[in-house]
């Protein structure tokens, strides 16, 4: 996501955010990273984050979550990483809960998380249904 990063202006030259998409920064972040010669990170918090209960991440409905998933699905086939895959899987499960639509994910035999193990056993559609059923009884607060 774009909000917690510092960029050189020239990285954005020729790039545009997609019109009409929520989470639009997720669509161009891979392109920005591909233009970088160096990426530096720090574990030190350098700003104060404000959790906006009315912000897009807290109020995202089906269309917004679908936009987020589609942005990640463009990148997922190129990024062979179990942790990233588990995050995208969680987004796909959220999209199903909000829309009832199953969006196919590329097949990887990851088994880092319980959800990934269950995905490999029963498939995405049944995992979506199971996840939604379980959330009727148990849901972590966001």
Listing of model-derived features with the role each one plays in the protein:
Residues 1-60:
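Conserved nucleotide-sugar donor-binding catalytic segment
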Residues 31, 70-74, 91:
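Alpha-helical elements of Rossmann-like donor-binding domains used by nucleotide-donor carbohydrate transfer enzymes
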Residues 35, 78, 98:
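Active-site catalytic microenvironments for nucleophilic, acid-base chemistry
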Residues 46-52, 58-82, 101-109:
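Catalytic core of nucleotide-sugar-dependent glycosyltransferases
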Residues 61-62, 83, 118, 137:
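Extended hydrophobic/Leu-rich segments
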Residues 78-86, 122, 142:
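Structural motif
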Residues 86-95:
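Amphipathic alpha-helical repeat scaffolds of TPR domains
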């Amino acid at each position: 996501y774009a909000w917690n990063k510092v960029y050189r202006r020239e990285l954005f030259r020729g790039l545009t955010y997609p019109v009409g998409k929520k989470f639009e920064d997720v669509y161009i972040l891979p392109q920005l990273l591909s233009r970088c010669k160096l990426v530096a990170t720090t574990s030190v918090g350098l700003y104060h984050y404000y959790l906006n209960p009315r912000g897009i991440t807290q109020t995202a409905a089906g269309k917004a979550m679908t936009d987020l998933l589609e942005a990640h699905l463009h990148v997922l086939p190129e990024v062979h990483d179990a942790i990233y895959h588990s995050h995208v899987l969680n987004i796909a499960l959220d999209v199903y809960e909000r829309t009832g639509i199953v969006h196919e994910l590329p097949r990887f035999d990851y088994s880092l998380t319980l959800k990934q193990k269950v995905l490999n056993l029963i498939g995405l559609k049944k995992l979506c249904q199971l996840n939604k059923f379980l959330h009727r009884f148990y849901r972590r607060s966001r």
